[in-house]
């Protein structure tokens, strides 16, 4: 049986990046990220939790320690558990992302590892 939970609220991770929880089950959860231009979150990663992001509106640069991916509308990226990443709105307007994640791997709960300070300012050119 799948139990639907509806904790619709804003996350407090970064007050300029709005996270809206859509729904959560025992296996997966879904959310929307909304932020204005030239906003980025901190480099971080999740243990026991894969993420998929799809750009609904705007442009998102996904930075990892080894590569950058510039995503346009309807582009999608998979970030595996334990892979550090940073989401950056490098477009000229609002960015809307649809996020999906699993609720843990091999029975282990998902966790967010404390933020890893970014050394790349959002104003640097993005190499695609």
Residue ranges and their predicted role:
Residues 1-29, 42, 112-128:
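A short, N-terminal "cap"/entry segment at the start of jelly-roll beta-barrel domains
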Residues 81-108:
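Ligand-binding loop in jelly-roll beta-barrel domains
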Residues 40-42, 61, 77, 81-87:
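Histidine-centered metal-chelating micro-motifs
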Residues 31-46:
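Conserved short histidine dyad/triad with adjacent acidic residue
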Residues 66-81:
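Short acidic-glycine-tyrosine-enriched beta hairpin
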